[in-house]
Regions:
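Catalytic core of DAGKc-family lipid kinases
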Residues: 5, 38-40, 78-186
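ATP/NTP phosphate-donor binding region
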Residues: 1-63, 70, 75, 107-111
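Helix N-cap/beta->alpha junction signal
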Residues: 64-65, 138
Length: 186
């Protein structure tokens, strides 16, 4: 049997993923894949890296929103682990999963994972900070919006909660210089 790590955020989105957990486990077991679960705890990335090193999974499934994906990507890089990462978007926006066309039918998604289907995506790094990203690198006034919006508003308003918070920050906008290097070119 193949072993995969399931890293899930119990409060992302409407905190509904927990209700679907047994269904997900059963789908993977049909394909002889055992899931070892890890429940995220805010800033517990060091513990997440340790967990991944200890169980040595063949792959990882991140269930949560874009913040969960970000935490898992950074834990993988911190621990120098190079294994496939699957995403089950269960957050408020799930921008990255949506961009990749991941979502909806879990059964066919699990079948693709069991068949070792994957694709490569670019991994960015913020030099000097040692932080990695796969979806968005942002800077400036609007960067904290995702973290500043209270869960109660995200759960009741969804994406609109982010937009409303962003509108409130517009008077504070200002420009600043940025230097970008991509594929070795400035």
């Amino acid at each position: 049997m193949k072993k995969m790590a399931l890293i899930y955020n119990p409060v992302s989105g409407h905190a509904l993923f927990k209700e679907k957990l047994d269904t997900l486990i059963e789908l993977f077991q049909r394909h002889d894949i055992i899931l070892s679960s890890y429940r995220t705890r805010g800033n517990g990335q060091d513990q997440l890296s340790q967990f991944l090193c200890e169980i040595a999974p063949a792959g990882i499934l991140a269930a949560g929103g874009d913040g969960t994906v970000h935490a898992v990507v950074n834990a993988l890089q911190d621990a120098k682990i190079d294994i496939p990462l699957g995403i089950l978007g269960s957050g408020t926006s799930n921008d990255f999963a949506t961009h990749l066309g991941i979502g909806g039918d879990w059964e066919s998604y699990v079948e693709r994972i069991a068949a070792d289907e994957s694709r490569r995506v670019d991994l960015g790094v913020l030099e000097g900070q040692g932080r990695y990203f796969v979806n968005v690198l942002s800077a400036g006034v609007l960067t904290g919006i995702a973290h500043e919006v209270k869960s109660v508003y995200k759960n009741s308003l969804g994406r609109i909660a982010y937009y409303l918070k962003g509108i409130g920050e517009l008077p504070r906008l200002h420009s600043f210089p940025v230097h970008i290097t991509a594929d070795g070119e400035h």
